[in-house]
Structures are given as structure tokens and as C-alpha cells.
């Protein structure tokens, strides 16, 4: 007789292989400061029981130039690829740029006793999202199985196969354009103030195109890069720090505001305008609002 091993015949493995190469450069020439960075990466995730591993590759860079500790410019980029997308749409290029001006290093503000630090800054860039969830390889057509139907003289149940979600050979990266404008300031060397305004336009969001593909076509509709969402708002923070004898203290607070709106969602045509999700916030709940109960037949007859 042998011993029963509850784990016999059962195994699970997950291997994550990540490779990264990095090159940095930083040098100052008098009043000129130059720095740069280049990076390449490759990620592979293999899970037991899955025939196809997950692959992501990319490279990126950052280049910065500063003049006399007053003017700053920076350019960054990413060139990334994901196996989630078909050949020809697998890679995306995502650049960004920013500028800054430290006004208190100018001669007319250098020794100001009230405004001891002021930096104005702005940035604009494009980012991409490959973590889309759902089905992998939505650009490839596949078949599902399920259900049975009687076949033959014996009416034996035969398993059925049917066409799965329609392939989308044009699926690609979701993208976001980001604009940020703000400043950092210090008053009397004690009060720090930071302000940021942001405007983010998301495009090519994966959504089901109910408007362009009606239900009567007879197949399960694929997700397509049709959605558009806008997010904008501001953030204001302040921090006051001081010292009384040997006692250090600070007071900090902030105000935030953000608003998002669905600009386009390819939703089906509705009978009434209030039924559309477009123009409202993301994931906003919808429902009918009751105005009361009927009291009697006369109340029913008088209702609109």
C-alpha cells in the first residue's frame, strides 16, 4: 500500500522574466547643464497551462537642458510594443515635452524678501495604455463551444461550436493627451504654494460600437477604439512651516477639483435624450425618479 499525496498530479508555475538596460549622461558646462537617459526593456510572463506567453517590449528616453538655473526644457519619449495588438499596430510612439522658468533666479527678483521662490512650468504629452483587460488577441477570429443539439436516429446530444466575438483587426493602443500648467512659489521662506491645472483627453478607448453595428447583424460585436473621455481640473496645496524656539511645526492643506465627461461612446440611438450616457460623467448611475404614488382613479386620469 502507498501513501495518498493530495498534490500529486497538480502543479502551477508562473515565471516573470524582466530585462532592462539603462544609460545615463549628466554634465555641466559653465551655465549650461545637460542630462540624458536611454532605457530599453523587455518583459515576458509565462503561466503554466497557457501556450502563449505575455510579451511587452519598449524603449524610452529623457533629455533635459537647463540654462543658468533659470530656464529648463525637457523632452521624453517612449516607444512601446505589446502582443495585445496586431502586426502594424503593435507599437506606439508617445512623446512629451515640458518647460520651466525659475523667475526668482532673474536679476529683478533674485533678492526679493517676500517672494523667495517662484517657478512657472508647463508640460504636454501623449501616453498609451496597453493594459486593456478582457480577451487577448481580439484581432484574431476564434470559435466558442457550448450547448448541445440532438443528432442522428438515436437523438444523441452533440456538442456545438459557434462563431465567437467578431475579430477587430484594427485594435490598437488607447491614448491620452495630457496638458499641465502650474507654478511653485515660496513666500517669506515659510509658506509654500503649489498650483496645477490639468486637462486630459483620452481617445481610442475600447468600447462596444452599438451605434455603428446594430443588433440584428447576428454576431457578438467586438470592442473598438471609439470612446472619448475628457478629464480636467486643478489642485492647490499650501504648507506653512515655522519654528518657535526649539519647537518646529507646520500646517498644510489643499483644494482639489476634477470633472470628467464622456465625449463619445458609440452608444445606440435612444428615444429620449436623457437616456444617453454621452455628456455625463464616467460610471454615473442612471435610473428613473419617482414623483409619488397614485391616490385614486381620478389621480390616474389627471396624470400626463
Give the ranges of each region predicted by the language model:
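Extracellular/periplasmic, surface-exposed regions of secreted and cell-surface proteins
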Residues: 1-287
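Extended, highly charged linker/hinge segments and catalytic-adjacent loops that couple domains
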Residues: 294-298
